[in-house]
């Protein structure tokens, strides 16, 4: 088994046949070595027990039930007094049944088989190392043609081929004729090589260091040559140089990881533990089996057939043997990666078999679904909605999600306050949703942050911590300013919520991951908590005001015409004099009493420095009063002067929206200044 404390990473690579044998074989107490799967059977149809030496054999993979052998005998696991440690009749050890989750077996292949990942996947590692075309290697692997072994001292087939050329145009077609001759098997095995065995021989003869040296020399020679002037030839040179670089890198990787190239050709085929390819009984007594079991059975059937052809009959035609070797190669290819050679293999219901590659790759594969992104406890998921009244570091959790996430903490609180005698009573109170439950839940949530995450997590700000509060409904409320870090919007996006359990995780969430501590982008340093989308539209509406300017009166015929056009569409609108207010509180109060609108223009008394008023600006209008005072009306402000031209007061032309926006900014600045003064 993999120790989680010693092993912190997982890597897929090549292993030697000796390592596969060490993983799969075991010695039972009577000295017998078991581990090889020789029969393509699973369960006996009468006894419903695993077949001996089959794909679910209890001698190889361990007992189905802990401490119970195939005969039905029982022994206490771990008891030193119990003797023997295995059943002498069936050979099953008395161990825990969990061994069937990691105990492997193996199939001893009669002929070598190339691993399809290293042959057909692009780039082809076997083709790169041998520096041969992929089509040529495929023809050799699948027994479409053969090649002669180099033998110098003895007569070879190459020396005899001249006598057949007058009858057969191509001498390679004469090889199958020799294969059908009785007693020619010795000569054939000595001189003719085909299938994956031929690939294995060539890979075993490779010297990786010489490959690196020769490739480097050729790469330098190609680099010294200048452009040929022919575009096609120049492209061929560039492709050849790229190939040489890949070949050198591949050879260096094999040397660095102590991997032999011939390991890409399999002699022993590992068999997965039975719990990873189960057979399940469903309603009605029917059995459901993993597709991998059927693919393993196909491999064993064809391998046993090849063994019988080679051992039982010496007069077997060579073409039949080559055809059976090809079937074994195709069966192993289908087991490892169904459909990689073209049309995938299907069952009787025209359903594609799910191979080993299909099990581990993709979003629903073993790695991404179970190992990397598996679902965890103390987590939930829901749609996010905007929470404008929330603080930047807070989020709103629905009651339904919060009570599930913090259920254990609420149970502990109920028991500590002697409101429940045990866990069962506490759970019943939670199901009944008593008021005391929500009070304890709020106390728990005040001291416990939560983590919000939106997939995909492309950078550090994709997961941040927040202080949760209870909200009604079934959606998570989020402050709109933190959306840019998550790359989220409120059109149906979902976010996951997690509860940090350990003290270290809670400390990290509070000190490093709170949203108000991540205001700048970690990549470029720009502010990331800035208004976007709906907030910008809201600010525009809040500060837009009315389209009628100060000159919209009878003295300006253009604006008067526009005003008359507006009255056509807004028949309920009645022009009124713009009101005057002494302070912002009176203006906001009038808006709340619905005396004015949000974008209605008004005059607000303002403490404005005279120096900011342009001296050359000419007033648009001047209104005189009976006592001699007069009003100078400008584009955006109004000055009240006395007869002696002394300034009494200044009014600015604004709206309630502008006033509200200004007050929010002023309060935020004052709060920030107070916080800074407290820190100093």
Swiss-Prot record:
Q: Name one GO cellular component term.
A: mitochondrion
What is the UniProt remark on how the cofactor binds and its stoichiometry?
Binds 1 Mg(2+) ion per subunit.
Which positions are annotated as binding Mg(2+)? 489, 491, 493
The coenzyme or cofactor needed here is:
Mg(2+); Zn(2+)
One of its GO biological process terms is: DNA-templated transcription
Q: Where in the cell is it found?
A: Plastid, Chloroplast
According to the UniProt entry, what is the EC number of this protein?
Answer: 2.7.7.6
List, in alphabetical order, the Gene Ontology terms for molecular function in this entry. Answer: DNA binding; DNA-directed RNA polymerase activity; magnesium ion binding; zinc ion binding
Which keywords fit this entry according to its UniProt record? Chloroplast, DNA-directed RNA polymerase, Magnesium, Metal-binding, Nucleotidyltransferase, Plastid, Transcription, Transferase, Zinc
Q: Which cysteines are joined by disulfide bonds?
A: none
Domain of life per record: Eukaryota
Q: Which residues bind Zn(2+)?
A: 69, 71, 87, 90
Reaction(s) catalysed by this chain's protein: RNA(n) + a ribonucleoside 5'-triphosphate = RNA(n+1) + diphosphate
**Which InterPro entries has this protein been placed in?**
DNA-dir_RpoC_beta_prime, RNA_pol_asu, RNA_pol_N, RNA_pol_Rpb1_1, RNA_pol_Rpb1_3_sf, RNA_pol_Rpb1_clamp_domain, RNApol_RpoC1
First-tier enzyme category under EC: transferase
Q: Which family does it belong to?
A: Belongs to the RNA polymerase beta' chain family. RpoC1 subfamily.
How this chain assembles, per its entry, is:
In plastids the minimal PEP RNA polymerase catalytic core is composed of four subunits: alpha, beta, beta', and beta''. When a (nuclear-encoded) sigma factor is associated with the core the holoenzyme is formed, which can initiate transcription.
Q: Please state what the protein is called.
A: DNA-directed RNA polymerase subunit beta'
């Amino acid at each position: 088994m993999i120790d989680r404390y010693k092993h912190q990473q997982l890597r897929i690579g090549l292993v030697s046949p000796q390592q596969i044998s060490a993983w799969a074989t075991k010695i039972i107490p009577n000295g017998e070595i078991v581990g090889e799967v020789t029969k393509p059977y699973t369960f006996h149809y009468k006894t419903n027990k695993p077949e001996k030496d089959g794909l679910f054999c209890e001698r190889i993979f361990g007992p189905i039930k802990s401490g119970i052998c195939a005969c039905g005998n029982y022994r206490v696991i771990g008891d030193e007094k119990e003797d023997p440690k295995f059943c002498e009749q069936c050979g099953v050890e008395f161990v825990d049944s969990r061994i069937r989750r990691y105990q492997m077996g193996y199939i001893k292949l009669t002929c070598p088989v190339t691993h399809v990942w290293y042959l057909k996947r692009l780039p082809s590692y076997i083709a790169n190392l041998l520096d041969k075309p992929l089509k040529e290697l495929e023809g050799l692997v699948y027994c479409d043609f053969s090649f002669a072994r180099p033998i110098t001292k003895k007569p070879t087939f190459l020396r005899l081929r001249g006598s057949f050329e007058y009858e057969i145009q191509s001498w390679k077609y004469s090889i199958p004729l020799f294969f059908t001759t009785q007693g020619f098997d010795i000569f054939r095995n000595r001189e003719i090589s085909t299938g994956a065995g031929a690939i294995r021989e060539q890979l075993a003869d490779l010297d990786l260091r010489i490959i690196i040296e020769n490739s480097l020399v050729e790469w330098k020679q190609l680099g010294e040559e200048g452009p040929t002037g022919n575009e096609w030839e120049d492209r061929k040179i560039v492709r050849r140089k790229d190939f040489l670089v890949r070949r050198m890198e591949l050879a260096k990787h094999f040397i660095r990881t102590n991997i032999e190239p011939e390991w890409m050709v399999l002699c022993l085929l590992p068999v997965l533990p039975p719990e990873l390819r189960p057979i399940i009984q469903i309603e009605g007594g029917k059995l459901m089996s993993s597709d991998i079991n059927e693919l393993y059975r196909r491999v064993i059937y064809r391998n046993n057939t090849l063994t019988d052809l080679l051992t039982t009959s010496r007069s077997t035609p060579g073409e039949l043997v080559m055809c059976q070797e090809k079937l074994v190669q195709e069966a192993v290819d289908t087991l490892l990666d169904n459909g990689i050679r073209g049309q995938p293999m299907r069952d009787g219901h025209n359903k594609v078999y799910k191979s080993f590659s299909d099990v581990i790759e993709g979003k629903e594969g073993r790695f991404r679904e179970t190992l990397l992104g598996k679902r965890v406890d103390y987590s939930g998921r829901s749609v996010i909605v905007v929470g404008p009244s929330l603080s930047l570091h807070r989020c709103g959790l629905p009651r339904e999600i919060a009570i599930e996430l913090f259920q254990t903490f609420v149970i502990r609180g109920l028991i500590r306050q002697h409101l429940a005698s045990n866990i069962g009573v506490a759970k019943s109170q939670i199901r009944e949703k008593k008021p005391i439950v929500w009070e304890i839940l709020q106390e728990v949530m005040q001291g416990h942050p939560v983590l919000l995450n939106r997939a995909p997590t492309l950078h550090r700000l994709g997961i941040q911590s927040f202080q949760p509060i209870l909200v009604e409904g079934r959606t998570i409320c989020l402050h709109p300013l933190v959306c840019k870090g998550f790359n989220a919007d409120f059109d149906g996006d979902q976010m996951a919520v997690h509860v940090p359990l350990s003290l270290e995780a809670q400390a990290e969430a509070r000190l490093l991951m709170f949203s108000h501590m991540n205001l700048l982008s970690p990549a470029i340093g720009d502010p990331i908590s800035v208004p976007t989308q709906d907030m910008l539209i809201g600010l525009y509406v809040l500060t837009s005001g009315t389209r009628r300017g100060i000159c919209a009166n009878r003295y300006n015929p253009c604006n008067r015409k526009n005003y008359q056009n507006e009255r056509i569409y807004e028949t309920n609108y009645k022009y009124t004099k713009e009101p005057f207010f002494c302070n912002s509180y009176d203006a906001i109060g009038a808006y709340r009493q619905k005396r004015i609108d949000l974008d209605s223009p008004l005059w607000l008394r303002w403490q404005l420095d005279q120096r900011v008023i342009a001296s050359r600006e000419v007033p648009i209008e001047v209104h005189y009063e009976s006592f001699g005072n007069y009003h100078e009306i400008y584009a955006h402000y109004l000055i009240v002067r006395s007869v002696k031209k002394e300034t009494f007061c200044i009014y600015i032309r604004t709206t309630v929206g502008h006033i509200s926006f200004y007050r929010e900014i002023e309060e935020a600045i004052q709060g920030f200044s107070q916080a800074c003064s407290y820190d100093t």
